[in-house]
């Protein structure tokens, strides 16, 4: 019987883990080892993927992958009752409790690092364990935090507050040191090549069993290390505890209970980190095998034999011996290549591995994973007291019955997103935008009167009022709309709902050749294409990553909101504006789906990446996190308004004001009219062949908001004059074109970086412009046939 065949609510014991390659290794790293008990919790609304519970957390995987996992001892679940019996009243160790002397440490050879000398720390941990929150507390930084696996996709550096000599690098979250995706490679390469003075390993205390799997591998690196037990406040609130002193004695590293969200225990954590780094105190334990146990004893003998075999090679390659030995036993090809074993050594290694597999009855990868999780289980039995079920988990189960239910998931998603758009474009955002517009108009009028009274040169007066105030002011007026949208999206991400959306949408996206994990980068694309393109690094498949990058521009980014808001306000009554907005977003999604089908059948044939993802519990959104994201987006928008858009506005004003001989000219004889007239014929079949429109579209390549500022400048600040250039129907055609045409320069640069080719990035520009023209032309033709003009 396979895991795919058991029913919701049933327990089963894993017997064999089938499959091969990176996926199988990743499943083992996530705790799917032979002998592990799992519970099938739910099936996605479309029948695939499934969610299983194991080792205290929830994991998603597809039925096709579950069908490769054999199980036995299938029975109705009794996990909740069994967990309740483990609770015992144990005093909670207080934050800042004094420990025993750190005599269990090993001191590295060489002098201690004197106070004031530079120190570099790596902040490492699983995805979604609070790592970025801790980084912000340590450094005072404002990196984005979310309740979704894989928020950090690149390393970030900062200085520890109060310790100018100490820098810390926030590394992307990983589950093991056997890289499964590109962001995990960033973490592994940093640890192996940069050789930090210390590691701060953050562990989710509510999910300690899975988190310690990475801890064991970090300890094998032989780098001074301190373990930060995060979310201890949640553990205590639910009636559980972790016996910190016993845990650090058994592990051989300092263990500090903290709450990164509440800033508890951070000072003590910093003190321990500085101490172990300065005194070069490496973990006192790197051997986790029980030599007297059958399977563990075989693993123990194998690792020691391999370590003896490769000792000289590891030293030449600059690799920690224990780490290199365990990775070589696992079959890590990168480590094998770095060690450069000769033919005889390779043959001897093969014999040693074969002996391990014969004695344990497991393959090399499963044997190592089983050894680690066996040690963790014994460790947790001695140090962890779990409550029956946390309040967060109970709440998540209850909410998921509706939000991921078979018949309610999609209606809930559509309803939530419709509510967000209605509040953003029809109520809150629109009202605040109107108020800000009144304020900008008042400032503009005051400046106009002051310049007139001063008798300033008419050309300078035109530059300030018709150029800068009209262009930049028109873009600034849409700031409330963008802030409101990000407010709601940040709440949805912070709660953990976005991870559920990926779970619900996986089957749908698979039909167009993608994984549910691709949904999140594309959803980020509704905010900005640049971080969305960077977020594709969380996808382990090169095929999926490239496809997602190519599809991200179809998701309408927030930079286009000022264009939509300007045209919907000018041509549609208030009650229809949200409808038009939703229609535009849906058009982008539909076009993206159709393009994905084309890619799937042509350039990117093959299967999408497996959908293996941890589902976090729902959490109440952090006011600080939400406010931080809003501030970052508002700051980015303001910086763009007063840099790129400011320069574009001044340039447009200059080209509109002067002719080829630099004489002040009428707009229709200006340099801008000349340039626009060269491009205008391209757009004439679409119904907007005016040179001013084509000029605005050209400037939109620098930043989409420039379309609004350009049109405002060309219309002399009177946006009501748009009605002389467009009808409501041609306005819709124009909006469709701006929805789909080329991403901005920053997004193209991000695509070039991630695709690794300027040619590929140029292809994105040409492709988007071509698709935009064709779709807009089709809309124009259909509308004309229906009698619209």
Name each region found by the language model.
Residues 438, 442-446, 499-529, 605-629, ...:
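Juxtamembrane inter-helical linkers in multi-pass membrane proteins
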Residues 412-423, 485-490, 568-571, 584-598, ...:
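Hydrophobic core segments of alpha-helical transmembrane domains in multi-pass membrane transport
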Residues 403-503:
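Core alpha-helical transmembrane segments of integral membrane proteins
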Residues 226, 236-387:
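Alpha-helical transmembrane helix bundles of large polytopic membrane transport and channel proteins
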